[in-house]
Design a protein with these regions (language model features):
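A short, conserved alpha-helix in the catalytic core of glycosyltransferases
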Residues: 144-195
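Short, flexible, basic/aromatic active-site loop/helix in glycosyltransferases
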Residues: 117-144
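Glycine-rich, basic loop-to-helix element that forms the pyrophosphate-binding segment
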Residues: 41-62
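Short, acidic, metal-binding catalytic loop of nucleotide-sugar glycosyltransferases
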Residues: 3-12
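Active-site-adjacent helix/loop segment of glycosyltransferases
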Residues: 183-256
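Short beta-strand-to-loop acidic/aromatic patch adjacent to the donor-nucleotide binding site
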Residues: 63-75
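Conserved donor NDP-sugar-binding/catalytic core segment of glycosyltransferases
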Residues: 77-111, 117-119
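Short beta-strand/loop segment that forms part of the nucleotide-sugar
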Residues: 12-21, 40-42
């Protein structure tokens, strides 16, 4: 990830790495290989939401107009930054932009080309996942949510909205952020001109993790409780056996990291 970031064409940017109290030698490796990159070391693992919030709080407001949140298991195209920033220049209602994301091991196979959220059925999914790239995924468009793997926001917008909700310790915090943005009348845009690759596998029969799937389900139901209206929530409760079944059937196609 850091090697690809060093090659981006955008000139005015700073890389900041947040270490969520890792127990391996990540900190030592980064300090040795990238001594000029600021490293935010957290005193414990705050999860995705808490870790990113604390990394954001380390930024200086007068030096940060835009912020890109990026997972460490990614590789970026050298031109990925400006397409994410450009929409903000002409539309103040755009609060979040998100790139097209491919599987790294299969660089033409899509991992994310927009997000679907249905608060009646409880379905949350990626558009285009495991589909080969084609013209229909090359159009800028409003989308329901931006994946936390990579997205861009104005510094002030992220601060105004309060960052990630840390009641989501793992999973669905990215969906929650986008739904909060949209509830306020603002927009989330999918930007296919910006491209990154995610180091996950699209193979059938990925690693089975019961605890991981249970955490995903917990995150989903926290999401529904927060954002669904009473009728939608009743619908989701009635459909919950099918939602749970869908999550476990989806393990056949789960992402193996």
């Amino acid at each position: 990830c850091l090697e690809s970031l060093k090659k981006v064409s955008y000139s005015n940017y700073t890389i900041i790495v947040a270490d969520n109290n890792s127990s391996d030698n990540s900190v030592e490796t980064i300090n040795a290989d990238y001594p000029n990159i600021p490293l935010v070391r957290l005193d414990k693992n705050y999860g995705y939401a808490g870790g990113n919030n604390r990394a954001f709080n380390s930024l200086k407001e007068d030096e940060s107009e835009y912020v890109i949140f990026l997972n460490n298991d990614t590789v970026v195209d050298e031109n990925f930054i400006f397409p994410l920033i450009e929409p903000f220049l002409t539309n103040k209602n755009i609060y979040q932009t998100v790139p097209k994301i491919f599987y790294q091991k299969n660089p033409k196979l899509i991992w994310y080309a927009g997000g679907n959220v249905n608060l009646w059925t409880g379905k949350v999914s990626h558009k285009g996942i495991r589909q080969y790239d084609n013209e229909k995924y090359n159009l800028k468009s409003l989308t329901k949510y931006a994946t936390g793997c990579c997205f861009c926001m104005r510094y002030n917008d992220f601060k105004e909205i309060g960052g990630f909700d840390e009641n989501f310790p793992m999973y669905s915090e990215d969906v929650d952020l986008s739904l909060t943005i949209r509830k306020q009348g603002n927009e989330v845009w999918y930007i296919p001109e910006s491209i990154i690759w995610h180091k996950v596998s699209a193979s059938i029969g990925g690693s089975f993790s019961l605890s991981k799937n249970m955490k995903k389900l917990r995150g989903l139901f926290l999401l529904f409780k927060k954002h669904a209206n009473p009728f939608q929530y009743l619908s989701i409760i009635l459909l919950s056996p099918f939602i749970i079944l869908f999550q476990f059937v989806n393990l056949l196609f789960t992402i193996k990291k």
